[in-house]
Each structure stands twice: as structure tokens, then as C-alpha cells.
Amino acid sequence: MSEFVKPFNNDPFVGNLSTPVTTSTATKLYLGNLPIYRKGLTPLLRGLEIGMAHGYFLIGPFYILGPLRNSPNALLVGLFSAFGLIIILTLALTIYGLASFQDNGVGENLESSKGWRNFTSGFTIGALGGASVAYLVLNNISFFA
């Protein structure tokens, strides 16, 4: 087993293990294609893409598992619950940005206050839009009724 799991870059003081899963080409390719790591995206587009994905899947648990799951208004309540969670996540992202980046908006990358504000704005718009699209899909497809 020691030939498979070894210290990262053969340095035992790094604190990271190099395993066949973490160092495989498929894993690196998959992680490299995620919007947070993809090259050439502005922070606004990163936030928009991440927000759309999160907003789209947030409505499901509130709709299926919420306290009003057996009522006719379960989908609408699930949408508003997802909106509430998105607002909470937006506040958390805003607080993180205010606490972490003190550069007064210099720079356009994600590690600056302006970039983080753009990321948060994109996340909010994308998540609200993604939840709305999921609502429209679930509301208009008779398979889910």
C-alpha cells in the first residue's frame, strides 16, 4: 500500500497525501473544468455559473421534503424557501468578502474585494434565476405533478 499512497511531491512535510485518486489525470481534468478553476472567466461569470447550478438544485429538497410537501402550494413554498436560503448564502458571501479583502477594490481577480463583489453579485443573480427556472420546469411538466 505504501507504493500507492506517498507524500505529495515526495515531501513528507507538506501535509498532503498523493493518492491514485487525487493525482489522476481524470480528477485533475474534472476539477480543472469546474467554474471556480476554469481559466478565462471573470468573477461575475464564475458566480453566475455557480449560482445557476446551486439555485437549480436548491428548490428540490424544499419541494420534496419541506413541511408543506403534501399541499398544493408545496412547489411555490419550496421556491420561496430556496430564495430565502439564497439570500442567506449571499449575505454569508458578502460578509466573507468584507472580512477577507481589504484592498479597496483594486484588481479584477477573485482574490480582490471588487472581484469578490462581482462573484457575489453573479452568484445571487444566477441562483435566483436557477431556482426560478427549476420552478418553471417543475410547474409545467406534468410528469412531476
Swiss-Prot record:
Membrane topology category: Multi-pass membrane protein
Q: Which family does it belong to?
A: Belongs to the PsaL family.
Q: InterPro entries from the entry?
A: PSI_PsaL (IPR003757), PSI_PsaL_sf (IPR036592), PSI_suXI (IPR022980)
List localization entries: Plastid, Chloroplast thylakoid membrane
Question: Is tRNA-binding given among the entry's keywords?
Answer: no
What keywords does the record list, in alphabetical order? Answer: Chloroplast, Membrane, Photosynthesis, Photosystem I, Plastid, Thylakoid, Transmembrane, Transmembrane helix
Entry annotated with the keyword Coiled coil:
no
Q: Gene3D superfamilies recorded for this chain?
A: Photosystem I PsaL, reaction centre subunit XI
| Chief place where the protein resides | plastid
Entries under PANTHER family matching the protein: PHOTOSYSTEM I REACTION CENTER SUBUNIT XI, CHLOROPLASTIC (PTHR34803:SF2)
Can you supply a Gene Ontology BP term from the record? photosynthesis
The GO cellular component terms are:
chloroplast thylakoid membrane; photosystem I reaction center
Q: Which residues cross the membrane?
A: 48-68, 75-95, 125-145
User: What is the recorded name of this protein?
Assistant: Photosystem I reaction center subunit XI
Q: Which organism is it from?
A: Isochrysis galbana (Marine planktonic alga)
Gene that encodes it: psaL
